[in-house]
Regions:
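N-terminal Rossmann-like NAD(P) cofactor-binding subdomain of oxidoreductases
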Residues: 1
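Short glycine-rich phosphate-binding loop at a beta-alpha junction
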Residues: 156-168
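Short acidic-hydrophobic catalytic motif
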Residues: 60
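Claisen-condensing/thiolase-fold acyl-transfer catalytic domains that form or cleave C-C bonds
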Residues: 144, 171-172
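Conserved phosphate-binding/catalytic loops in two-lobed NTP-binding clefts
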Residues: 172, 176-197
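Glycine-rich phosphate-binding loop plus the immediately following alpha-helix
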Residues: 6-43, 50-51, 63-119
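Adenine-nucleotide phosphate-binding core of ATP-dependent small-molecule kinases
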Residues: 102, 106-157
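Short beta-strand scaffold segments in enzyme catalytic cores
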Residues: 52-57
Length: 197
C-alpha cells in the first residue's frame, strides 16, 4: 500500500524494527489504559533504546512505521541523512562497505556526535553544563517527535495515545521532552522497558 512506497520502486520502505515490543505495548495500553480492544484503538508507539522505531496501529494492525534509518536518529543509529553526501562518502574511497554500515548502525547517532551511546552519561554531561551534549540529545529527541508527527498525519490526526517505550523511556528527561512536544496530538503514555510477546 501507499505507506510502503518510497521515491524509487527498487527501494521500498521496510517496516521492521522493534515490532514485537511495539505490539506488546499497544496491546497493553489498549487493555489497561483505554479499556478496549486494540482493534478499536489508534495508537502510535515509539520504541527508543540503542536504536529506535515508531509504529502506527489502526484497527489492530501496524499500518505504518518509521525505522531508525529513516527520519529519526538514536543513540547508535545515524537516522535520516541527506542522501547525496552519503553517496559521496560511499564512493570517496575512504570507507569500506562495512565502515558505512557501521556508521549507519552502531557508530551513528549519539555515539558519532558525543563518543557514547549511554543516555545516562549524556544526561550527566547535560547536568554538568555541556551545551553541545544538550544540543545533540535534544536534536535526537526532536527527530523522534518529528517522526511521530508524521505518523499522526498518516492517522488523519486521530490518535488515542502516544506510547513511549524502550530503555530510554525510563528517562524523565526523554519523556518530559517528548511529552511537551507531542501532547497536542494525544495523551502520552510512558510504558518503559521491553515486553515482547
Amino acid at each position: 500500500d501507499e505507506a510502503r512506497l518510497s521515491g524509487h520502486p527498487v527501494l521500498p520502505r521496510m517496516m521492521t524494527g522493534h515490532a514485537l515490543n511495539c505490539r506488546a505495548m499497544a496491546l497493553r495500553c489498549a487493555a489497561d489504559v483505554l479499556h478496549k480492544p486494540l482493534a478499536d484503538c489508534r495508537l502510535i508507539v515509539l520504541h527508543l533504546g540503542g536504536g529506535g522505531s515508531a509504529r502506527l496501529f489502526i484497527g489492530g494492525k501496524m499500518v505504518d512505521g518509521v525505522r531508525d534509518d529513516e527520519w529519526m536518529f538514536a543513540p547508535e543509529r545515524m537516522g535520516g541523512v541527506s542522501l547525496q553526501p552519503l553517496v559521496a562518502m560511499c564512493y570517496s574511497g575512504a570507507y569500506t562497505k562495512q565502515d558505512i554500515m557501521d556508521l549507519i548502525r552502531g557508530k551513528g547517532g549519539l555515539m558519532a556526535h558525543l563518543g557514547t551511546a549511554s543516555a545516562q552519561e549524556v544526561e550527566q554531561r547535560i547536568a554538568d553544563g555541556d551545551a553541545h551534549a544538550k544540543l545533540v540529545y535534544d536534536g535526537m529527541l526532536y527527530s523522534c517527535a518529528r517522526a511521530i508527527g508524521g505518523l499522526a498525519a498518516a492517522a488523519d490526526g486521530r490518535v488515542d495515545r502516544i506510547i513511549l517505550t524502550g530503555g530510554l523511556a525510563h528517562s524523565r528527561y526523554v519523556t518530559g521532552y517528548l511529552t511537551q512536544k507531542l501532547s497536542f496530538i494525544a495523551p502520552v503514555e510512558v510504558m518503559a522497558g521491553e515486553f515482547e510477546l
